[in-house]
Structures are given as structure tokens and as C-alpha cells.
Amino acid sequence: MADCIASLACDRFEMDAWGVDVMIAGSQKGLMVPPGLAFVFFSEKAAEARRALPRVSRYWDWTNRANPEMFYQYFGGTAPTHHLYGLRASLDMIRAEGIEAIWDRHERLARAIWAACEAWGQTGPLELNIADPALRSRAVTALRIGAPHGSDLRRWVQDHAGVTLGIGLGMAEPGAPAWHGFFRIGHMGHVNAHMILGALGAIEAGLMALDIPHGSGGVAAAARVIAAAS
């Protein structure tokens, strides 16, 4: 089973080729739709395993939703009509760009962000949470910077540049001093080079304004990655 909530339409995923039996995803990440829709894709092997079960809770059973007698049964009730309109627009955008091009774009922009973060981390506390690039998400980058720098930086870029950075999830208990030492950069869905370079510029300005030790040339490193891919 694969959790693709934060990666669908961002990271390469080939369900059949990779032998995945069940995949779950949500609407609010790479599909660019507000939260509220969930998706379950399953293979024939998984369907056979379901049919062999003597008893299944209707809450978890996908059978009725996969083969409904009436349209509303896809959703277990009233259809989320406006979400479906949004999903239609999103899928049209994905089809127009092409999934291979979308995967390439996310790869390129992710590598630009990593280059910036690695440059900043040459001198100072900033480090990527995942050291191996092959294991990193192409949709979101989690960073460690030490408390209280994470919260201070998020606040500064929000107040002075209008950029919202994510909090660290699962890195420390909420309320603990260490909780303030992390942040995330989201780069999923309808994002492009000028959005990423603008966000990185805001972060670099925040590092300077707050006197957080960091290496120089983060934005330039990102620009080189983008330029090399053109």
C-alpha cells in the first residue's frame, strides 16, 4: 500500500509497474483542490483479497463506492460538487501540461530548493531533514535549523514578505522548546521557477535580518540549477 497524499502528481508514481495494490491520496496537495476529497485506488489482487474476507466494516469497505448503484454513493452521501468542479479544472491542467512534464518540473524545482538549503547550511545550523536526495520528497522539503530559529524565521517571512512556511510535523512535541527549530517549504502543484526563487529570496532575507548564521549564495545556487535545466 502506498500513501500518496503529499506526492500524487508531484513525485513519479507508477502503480501497476511497481506492483502497488492499494494507493490512497487526497485532493489538497499536488491536485491543487481544497481539502475534502480522498481517493483510493486498488488492484484486482486487492479486490480479490477483499472479496475473500467474510466480514468488512462498511466504513472501510470500498465495494459500494467502487461500484455504486447511484452517483451519490461514490461519496457516501451528498456529492462535494464544488470540489468536483475544482478537481475537473485541476485534471485539465495536468492533462494539458502532461504528467511527465509535471514530474520533471517538480524534480527541477525541488533540486533548486535543495541547492539553496545546502548553500545556507555550509555555515550555520540549517540542514535538510533527509540527507539522501534519492529519499527526499519532490513536493515538500523539511528542514532543521534549531530553536528558536525555525519559528522566528517563519514569523519574519510571513510578516515581511507574505510567504507562509510550514511548521515541522512530528519533529518535536508541540509546546516543547525544540518544536521551534523546524520549518517546511512546500513546492507542489501549480508552482514555477519565479515562485520558488521568490520564496527562497524571502527566506534568505529572513536569515540575514534575524542574524541566523548561514552560508551565502543560496538563491544563486537555486538559480544555477534552474538555468542548467533550461
For each of these PLM feature ranges, what is it?
Residues 28-116, 230:
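Active-site C-terminal subdomain of aminotransferase-like
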Residues 16-28:
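Conserved active-site segment immediately N-terminal to the catalytic lysine
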Residues 126-198:
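Conserved C-terminal alpha-helix-loop-beta "cap" of PLP-dependent enzymes
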Residues 177-230:
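PLP-dependent enzyme catalytic core of the Aspartate aminotransferase-like
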Residues 97-105, 121-132, 168-169, 210-221:
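Flexible, glycine/charged-enriched surface loops at secondary-structure junctions
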Residues 1-4, 23-26, 33, 165-168:
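General beta-strand structural signal in soluble alpha/beta enzymes
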Residues 1-17:
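Catalytic PLP-binding core of fold-type I/II PLP enzymes
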